[in-house]
Swiss-Prot record:
A Pfam family recorded for this sequence: Ribosomal_S2
HAMAP family per record: Ribosomal_uS2_B
A GO CC term attached to the entry: cytosolic small ribosomal subunit
InterPro entries registered for this protein in UniProt: Ribosomal_uS2 (IPR001865), Ribosomal_uS2_bac/mit/plastid (IPR005706), Ribosomal_uS2_CS (IPR018130), Ribosomal_uS2_flav_dom_sf (IPR023591)
UniProt key word Methyltransferase: no
A GO term for molecular function: structural constituent of ribosome
Gene: rps2
Keywords attached to this entry: Cyanelle, Plastid, Ribonucleoprotein, Ribosomal protein
Gene source species: Cyanophora paradoxa
Protein name: Small ribosomal subunit protein uS2c
Biological processes per GO annotation: translation
Compartments, record wording: Plastid, Cyanelle
Protein family per UniProt: Belongs to the universal ribosomal protein uS2 family.
Amino acid sequence: MAIVTLDEMLEAGVHFGHQSRRWNPKMSQYIFTERNGIHIIDLVQTAQLLAEAYDFLRISAEEGKKVLFIGTKRQAANIIAQEATRCGAFYINQRWLGGTLTNWTTIQSRVEYLKELEMREESGALDLLPKKEAAILRRQLEKLRKSLGGIQTMRHIPDIVVIVDQKRENNAVQECKKLNIPIIALLDTNSDPDVVDIPIPGNDDAIRSIKLIIGKLADAILEGSHTKTSSAE
């Protein structure tokens, strides 16, 4: 059975690319046509590459590999958090902190500080501090939760990264490249498919498009994780 149907993708607007003047020529192989100054993405290729990404994630999850979802744009942030949480993956959906992967030991120390602040809040220790000091620490806690909450239980750098919008998340992409972490990316007609391992051409601005593609990738991880659990029993 197909991972996704053409009708599902059409309904979600996956086929709508950017204005043709804003394109990256490297995406030409994934463009079906141009209509009213907008590039239309070839959904047959989208379906094929989504299936490839699905199988890769399913098998990787069976092997116990860990996945990090990245999507910091407004349209993607909530979906990234929901779908990563649903399939037991990690996520970053606010600002990308430089060195998150390439300087992981420093980021780990910030994660530990986040955990410490959370423990102090839960125990009521923050309430015992002077109001001004408690307010400063609570602001720090809120900021750390936003930037690091989705990787709070990540023990080491991820085995695979899933990205929405390669162009926007290029700093994260470059860190993955340095560390040889495989990248799966939903990328629009203004992106560079050469810098990712499995490009999934599609509309990376529309909420329904992002939800459909990221949801399918989360399904793959869930399927692989269930197979792993069943095999262990």
